[in-house]
């Protein structure tokens, strides 16, 4: 079938799409853009004028095409926590991800994880030092935007560099599907995820708090620790404002 008779690829619908960005990263013609819906969730959209109908976006979509990459059978399960109490306190849970990430950095590898940027825009960043790793620590309960991170990761892997990618399971699956082969120098670490809201929801909440306290919010911690090992029953979050500093977000002041 010649190119003129080929059909525009059909991406998965909103009910299946996880905004993994595999299709967005694989398109060499930049014919796919990520569009935010009314809930602030991202979904891919094809520009018919730029699309050459190669079908690569369909091939790498983990919801449309099942692959057998990285199938290791039944997983082995371990329970652990970081012995260093200072670093453990700065992590949401036991600090296992920080320990693994630190080991990768000591081997001159690259660590990718979710971090807040300007206006608390959540995206994947690369950390190559322990200082840069601090931005990746702690949970962020909103959808992280991948942007073109997968392309950079592929270049690093093809150069033989060690890479650790940490993120939600759907983004890990999207990365591996985008790569289309297993890399011995790639490590991935996902987490138990119950679904995340779009950044538009969090943006509205941020605007609400800034109006309520008449101050600019600089960072937000959904599950802060009262001590190094946390405390059972702590149901509050912590917002840090430019002038007012830390303010607890409890039921009576949310």
Where are these regions (language model features)?
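Ferredoxin-type iron-sulfur electron-transfer modules and their immediate structural context
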Residues: 1-26, 30-34
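A short alpha-helix capping/helix-coil boundary motif
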Residues: 2-4, 37, 78-81
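A short, structure-level motif marking secondary-structure boundaries and short turns
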Residues: 7-10, 42-43, 84-86
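Sterically constrained small-residue positions within well-ordered secondary structures
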Residues: 8, 35-37, 156, 182
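Iron-sulfur cluster-binding cysteine motifs and their immediate structural context
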Residues: 22-39, 43-45, 56-73
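Short, charged amphipathic alpha-helical surface segments
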Residues: 49-50
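Iron-sulfur-associated redox domains of electron-transfer enzymes in respiratory
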Residues: 65-254
